[in-house]
Structures are given as C-alpha cells and as structure tokens.
Amino acid sequence: MTTTLFSSRIIQSALDFDVYKVNMMSAVAALYPDAMVSYKFIVRSEEDLSELLPEVKAEVLKLQDVRFTEDEIAYMKRVAPYLKPEFVEALRHFRFNPQSDVSFHNKTMSDGSSQLRITINGLWKETILYETIIMSIVSEVRSRQRWSDIPFEQFQTVLEDKVRYLKAELERRNITNFKFADMSTRRRFSFQAQRTMLEYLSKELPQCLTGTSNYHLARELDLTPIGTVAHEWFMGHQALVNVRDSQKIALQRWQKMFNGALGIALTDTIGIDAFLKDFDEELSHAYVGVRHDSGCPFTWGEKMIAHYESLGIDPMTKTLVFTDGLNFEQALDICEHFQGRVQVSFGIGTSLANDMGNYVNDQGEAYQPLSIVIKMVTCNGSPVAKISDEPEKAMCEDIFFLMNLKRRFEQPLDLNECRKLIDRLESEGQNYLIDA
C-alpha cells in the first residue's frame, strides 16, 4: 500500500468520474441530443480559491488528451449492460473540448475579495461529464497547494478510527443490515486518498461496502460501480417540457430508458411533498427505491414509508438510499431507526475521502474540506432550479423562475427564504436574474 496522499496525476483516466454522469449522458444523447446547457461552479466555503486558477485551468485543459480506451469500453459493456451497446461503442469517439466548453475567471465579490469562477457551456451530451471531474481537480489542487504537509499517517489513522468505531457500534447495536457505498469522487482530498480508503475498507468491511461511485476505481479494485441519476436530469426537464409536468416526465422517461435497471428516484429537486404527488402508484411500483439528499432523513423516511403503505406496497420491498453529507455515526442512527421497516442503504463521500480529523498546520489553521458545487443553471437558454428540502441547498439564478416553479408545484412561497437566497447569491458574486 502506498504511503503518500498524492499520485502523479489528478485525473487518472476517462473513467475517473461518478457513475451517474455517464448514465445521464446516455439518456441525454438518446432523448435530447440537441439540448444546450450551462453549468456554474460555486464555492460555498469562506475560502478564497482565486490563486488556484492557473493550476486548475491547466489541469482541466489536460482533459483534451483523455480518451476512452478499448479496455475501458469493454469493461463498461460488461458491468453496465443497461447502457445501450451503440452508446458505449460511441464513447471511443468522445473528446473533451475544454478550450471551448469551459471558461475560468476570478470574480471580485461585494466585499472586495476575489473568488474562483468556472462556467461550462455547450451541448448537454458533450458537457455532462465535466462536473465531477472538475470538482475533483479543484479539490486536489487546493490540497496540493495548501495542505501538502498533511502526513499520510494522519489520514490513515482517522480512517482506522472510523472503522473501529463502526465495527464496535454494529456489534453493540446488533445492526446486521448496514450497507454503504463510497461516493467521494467529487470532494475527495485527492485521488490517492480515495484509492487508499477504498483499498482499506474493501479489506476491513467487505460485508458493508457495496461499491463505489467511481468507475475508474471500481475497475481497478474489482468493486461494484454504484450510481443512478442526479438533480440535473430533473432540472433540465424544467426547460424541455411543461414545467409542472417536468418531474413526472423525467421519472417516466428515465424508467423507460433503462427498463427499470436504474430504479432509484431522487426526491428533492422540487421537494419531497411535490415529489410524492408525482410519484404515483405506477411509478412507486416501478422504481425499486428512492434517494434522500436533503432535509431531515427521519421525517423524509417516515413520509416514504407512509406513501408506500397508502398504496398497498410493503415498504420492506423498497429501498431508501441516504446520501446527504453523512458520516458513519449519522448513518447508523438512520439505519437503527428504520431497521425492520424498510430496506436502507447509504452513500458516504467527504467523511470517507476528505477527513483529516483534528489536523492543524504550523500556522494554526485547522483543516476543513471544501464545500463546492457545480450545478446546471440553464437549459436551452431558460433558467432551471433545484428547490431542495434544505433551503441552503437551493440553486437558481432567476428568482422569478424560482417563484413561478414553487407556485406551479404548489410549494409555499416564503419571502424571507427568497430574500436569503438573493443575499446568498449576492455574497457569492452571482446574478439572481437571468431573464425577466
């Protein structure tokens, strides 16, 4: 096993991204080949990343030389039979074009400080893979420039402590159904940290670790690639079909596209209450489960159980997947709460591949992982939004579109919440009006 937190490269191959990105790429290429989109990179942490711009840009531009190899294409055909063979074959011709697709600048904020800004524009099917790759690049460039003094042993010790805690708690609580997947690619400290973590967990917790969201590491370590769909699938539909029908149509077309093979529905693009209105009996039977990514997990889970029971569906035949910034302690509490009532599974990211414990550098600065996101902001020139079940996770640059979206889905319109969103957008140096 290596004893360093950094490898020679940041992005290892064309497969060094999250599984759900290529799933959505497949669906977009088949259903919306001409759709144009734009994404924005946002730093939520109170940390100036502007000085990282030259190295981040240089690393992103290296993507123009990345290709899907014959071995990688053969691997995807084997592990992802739900992807149409002609789509996988076409990946051999796929090329990243960051020179034209991705732009970088440092934006002056309202308080006079600077912040890194990245925008992505182009055909949806050609730009969809950038998100998790660019986030991985930003996170690792920051680690290399600012936290390269963290010793490997610090990360390893924190990881070993987590595993000891988990094993002890599973035995103490008599929990026998705890399953989780690694979902750390986007916010990993480094590629090597993610690899080290997966090597260790696959050895120490083979009965708990179900796989990883990273295709490259799944292939290298013989793990199951894990992933279904993300918010952008639902957000894009807001501009492609009648907005009130967008969530249901997105669910229906996803189900039809993959014949039920990727049947975990994401519930919080509009919010759980709006989701349940669209998640009718047919869809509830068709999807094998749902994913929680914001709001109180216990309240959400109780709502899902009640929904299934109201339709005469045994909740034990369905799976609730929890992925909202979890650590082992939080996941165990959720698992224990729902044990014997519904199947549960977890996706854990930052806590696994970007936790350095109580590390403090020589300047007295305590290490904290970055909070960064890349989200779709327009599709075919029209604004799109994520409302979320957690106001701080809401994403929209057009406050009027957001208000209309809430009205159409019969969601409460909280003016204080809108004001907070505008204040947050202003503090992040973003516009909050695309088109009036």
UniProtKB/Swiss-Prot annotation:
Biological process annotations from GO: NAD biosynthetic process via the salvage pathway
CC annotations in GO: cytosol
Enzyme Commission number(s): 6.3.4.21
Modified residues (Phosphohistidine): 231
Record InterPro entries: N/Namide_PRibTrfase (IPR041525), NAPRTase_N (IPR040727), Nic_PRibTrfase (IPR006406), Nic_PRibTrfase-Fam (IPR007229), Nicotinate_pribotase-like_C (IPR036068)
PTM per Swiss-Prot/TrEMBL: Transiently phosphorylated on a His residue during the reaction cycle. Phosphorylation strongly increases the affinity for substrates and increases the rate of nicotinate D-ribonucleotide production. Dephosphorylation regenerates the low-affinity form of the enzyme, leading to product release.
Reactions catalysed according to its record: nicotinate + 5-phospho-alpha-D-ribose 1-diphosphate + ATP + H2O = nicotinate beta-D-ribonucleotide + ADP + phosphate + diphosphate
Pfam family, one: NAPRTase
One Gene Ontology MF term: nicotinate phosphoribosyltransferase activity
Pathway: Cofactor biosynthesis; NAD(+) biosynthesis; nicotinate D-ribonucleotide from nicotinate: step 1/1
Lineage: superkingdom: Bacteria
Keywords: Ligase, Phosphoprotein, Pyridine nucleotide biosynthesis
HAMAP family: NAPRTase (MF_00570)
Function (record text): Catalyzes the synthesis of beta-nicotinate D-ribonucleotide from nicotinate and 5-phospho-D-ribose 1-phosphate at the expense of ATP.
PANTHER family tied to this protein: NICOTINATE PHOSPHORIBOSYLTRANSFERASE
Family: Belongs to the NAPRTase family.
Name the UniProt record assigns to this protein: Nicotinate phosphoribosyltransferase
Species whose genome carries this gene: Vibrio parahaemolyticus serotype O3:K6 (strain RIMD 2210633)
